C-alpha cells in the first residue's frame, strides 16, 4: 500500500475511534447537564420544607393550663378590689415572649387605669435571683403600670394554671375569671389578635366575645431551660 493510502486509512480509523469515544461519553455528558437543574430542584424543595416547618412551629400553640375560675385563695398576690386584675406568667428566657410583652404594652397604653397588672417571672430553685432578670424583665419594667415578681419555682404560676410563657389571666374586682389565654397571634409575632382585643374589651366594657385563646410560647417548666445559658430556644409542646 502506498504511503498516501496508509495515511487515508489512518485518518479514517482515527475518525471512527473518535466518534466511538464521543458516543461513549454522551451519557455522562447528558448527566452533567442535568446536575444544575437537579441542584435547583433540591434547593427549592429544601427551602419549601424549611418554610413549612417554620410555619408549623410559629402556629402551634403551647399547652394551656386551666386558670381557676375564682381568684386562688392560696396566692400571695394582691387582687385589686376596685378594678380588674391581670396576671401574666413568663419564662424569663423565652424569646417568643417579647411579643407577649409588646402586646401587654399596647393593652396598658389603652387601659392602664382600669387594670392592675402583675407579670410573674419563673425562676427554678437553686439559682440566684439574677437568673430571671433578663431583657424580658427589663422590658416588663418599662411598661407603665406593670408590677414584676420573681416566682420562685413557679409556685404562683401553678396556682394560676400558667404552664406556657405568655399565659394571661384576667379577673374582675370580685375575683371572677374573665379571660385566660395568650395575647399574640403566633409565636413571636406582634399585631392585632383575638387575645389582646378580648382583654381590651373585657377591661374597658366588661364584655367580650372571646374568653379563651391559645398561648404561643415556651413551656414554663422545662428542665432544659434551667441552666446558666442565656439562650433558650422555644420548643413545641410534647
Enumerate the predicted regions with their spans.
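Thiol-/selenol-based redox modules, centered on thioredoxin-like
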Residues: 178, 182-238
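Short, internal strand/loop/helix patches
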Residues: 136-171, 177-178
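Short, thiol/selenol-centered motifs that function as redox-active sites or metal-ligating centers
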Residues: 91-101, 125-129, 168, 216-238
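Hydrophobic membrane-insertion alpha-helices, especially the h-region
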Residues: 36-52
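Short active-site neighborhood of thiol/selenol oxidoreductases, capturing the structured segment around
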Residues: 80-104, 199
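A short beta-strand-turn-helix
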Residues: 66-84, 103-106
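Structural microenvironment flanking redox-active thiols in thiol-disulfide oxidoreductases
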Residues: 98-141, 152-159
Amino acid at each position: 500500500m502506498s504511503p498516501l493510502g496508509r495515511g487515508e486509512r489512518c485518518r479514517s480509523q482515527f475518525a471512527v475511534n473518535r466518534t466511538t469515544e464521543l458516543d461513549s461519553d454522551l451519557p455522562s455528558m447528558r448527566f452533567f447537564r442535568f446536575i444544575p437543574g437537579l441542584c435547583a430542584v433540591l434547593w427549592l424543595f429544601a427551602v419549601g420544607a424549611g418554610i413549612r416547618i417554620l410555619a408549623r412551629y410559629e402556629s402551634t400553640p403551647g399547652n394551656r393550663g386551666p386558670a381557676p375560675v375564682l381568684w386562688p385563695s392560696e396566692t400571695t398576690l394582691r387582687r385589686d378590689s376596685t378594678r380588674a386584675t391581670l396576671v401574666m406568667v413568663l419564662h424569663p428566657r423565652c424569646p417568643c415572649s417579647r411579643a407577649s410583652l409588646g402586646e401587654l404594652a399596647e393593652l396598658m397604653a389603652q387601659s392602664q387605669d382600669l387594670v392592675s397588672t402583675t407579670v410573674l417571672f419563673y425562676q427554678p430553685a437553686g439559682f440566684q435571683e439574677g437568673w430571671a432578670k433578663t431583657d424580658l424583665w427589663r422590658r416588663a419594667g418599662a411598661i407603665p403600670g406593670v408590677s414584676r415578681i420573681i416566682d420562685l419555682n413557679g409556685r404562683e404560676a401553678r396556682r394560676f394554671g400558667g404552664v406556657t410563657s405568655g399565659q394571661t389571666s384576667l379577673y374582675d374586682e370580685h375575683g371572677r375569671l374573665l379571660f385566660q389565654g395568650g395575647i399574640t397571634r403566633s409565636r413571636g409575632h406582634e399585631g392585632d389578635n383575638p387575645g389582646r382585643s378580648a382583654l381590651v374589651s373585657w377591661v374597658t366594657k366588661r364584655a367580650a366575645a372571646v374568653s379563651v385563646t391559645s398561648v404561643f410560647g415556651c413551656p414554663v417548666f422545662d428542665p432544659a431551660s434551667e441552666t446558666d445559658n442565656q439562650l433558650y430556644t422555644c420548643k413545641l409542646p410534647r
